[in-house]
């Protein structure tokens, strides 16, 4: 997000400078100096771009023969989402963080593996350098391949019905959760001019999305407590004893089944930045907060978010 802001500020500065120069009659010598400076800046930018693109070119000319290569960005939650799954599956991978300021995402070699020129993208060097783009597609590829190679995958399922439930939440995250937070961040921090109605609209939609998740997790918790806290189940059902008094009230619950899957873990990086749009998960969505807290403690998640 920071890089986008930097681009916006730079563009605005250049635009203001251009407008200012039009209103001033410069002497020939001064004009020549300005032209020279602009030319030097242009040449420097071109050299930097060639250097950055050559970094990508060099990689594609000498690709590894094993492991995975993840193309990401330091400010891209979707890239870290894929890194979490790679880490959870204990798969060997290397991350290349693209420099958007220098246009590395538009390098011809990168566009051949992701025509959308965005991150994340993944290359599987074990499988003839197969490339996959879009975070949801990458995740499904990884867990499906892991299941095929190992016979089981804790983050996925070999049951078609459970697979469809996991996929539903994964697609909900990629199509509803992430884009709404992304738009709320954009209009709050990076848009060229304030648009309060857009900020309100997207923030409200993020809250609606979290309401869906909160309800699902609350239902899972109630079922867990009623199943495990048998001696108090009648009191909970009658409403004479609140569920919050159960010793199982803080046990982890998951969207599908009794374990964390990609349905859960795909939400982590975006949950980690939602406070920047003024949403307090702990106060507004306590089940989502507890769920996120449990996932953030997982060693693989910690490694992935650190960029290890």
Swiss-Prot record:
Record-linked PROSITE patterns: GST_CTER, GST_NTER
Start and end residues of each GST N-terminal domain: 66-150
GO biological process: negative regulation of transcription by transcription factor localization; nitrate assimilation; protein urmylation; regulation of nitrogen utilization
Record function comment: Plays an important role in the cellular response to the nitrogen source. URE2 gene plays a major part in the repression of GLN1 and GDH2 genes by glutamine, and is required for the inactivation of glutamine synthetase. URE2 gene product may catalytically inactivate GLN3 in response to an increase in the intracellular concentration of glutamine.
Family (UniProt): Belongs to the GST superfamily.
A GO cellular component entry from the record: cytoplasm
GO molecular function, one term: transcription corepressor activity
One Pfam family hit: GST_C
Self-association state and partner proteins as the record states: Homodimer.
Entry protein name: Protein URE2
Entry keyword set: Nitrate assimilation
Domain GST C-terminal, first and last residues per copy: 159-308
């Amino acid at each position: 997000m920071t890089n986008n802001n930097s681009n916006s500020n730079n563009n605005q500065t250049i635009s203001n400078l251009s407008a200012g120069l039009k209103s001033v009659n410069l002497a020939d010598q001064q004009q020549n100096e300005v032209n020279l400076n602009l030319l030097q800046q242009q040449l420097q930018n071109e050299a930097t771009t060639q250097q950055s693109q050559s970094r990508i070119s060099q990689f594609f000319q000498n690709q590894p023969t094993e492991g995975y290569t993840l193309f990401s960005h330091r400010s891209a939650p979707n890239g870290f989402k894929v890194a979490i799954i790679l880490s959870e599956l204990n798969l060997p991978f290397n991350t290349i963080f693209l420099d958007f300021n220098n246009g590395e995402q538009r390098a011809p070699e990168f566009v051949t593996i992701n025509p959308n020129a965005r991150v994340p993208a993944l290359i599987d060097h074990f499988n003839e350098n197969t490339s996959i783009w879009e975070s949801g597609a990458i995740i499904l590829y990884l867990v499906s391949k892991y299941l095929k190679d190992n016979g089981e995958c804790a983050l996925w399922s070999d049951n078609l019905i459970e697979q469809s439930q996991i996929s539903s939440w994964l697609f909900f995250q990629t199509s509803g959760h992430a884009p709404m937070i992304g738009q709320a961040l954009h209009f709050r921090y990076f848009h060229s001019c304030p648009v309060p109605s857009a900020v309100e609209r997207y923030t409200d939609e993020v809250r609606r999305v979290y309401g869906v998740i909160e309800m699902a997790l609350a239902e899972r918790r109630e079922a867990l407590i009623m199943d495990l806290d048998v001696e108090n189940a009648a009191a909970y059902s009658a409403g004479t004893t609140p569920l919050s008094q159960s010793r199982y009230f803080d046990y982890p619950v998951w969207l599908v089944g009794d374990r964390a899957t990609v349905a859960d873990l795909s939400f982590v990086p975006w949950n980690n930045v939602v406070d920047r749009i003024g949403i307090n998960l702990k106060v507004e969505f306590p089940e989502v907060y507890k769920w996120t807290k449990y996932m953030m403690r997982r060693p693989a998640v910690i490694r992935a978010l650190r960029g290890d």
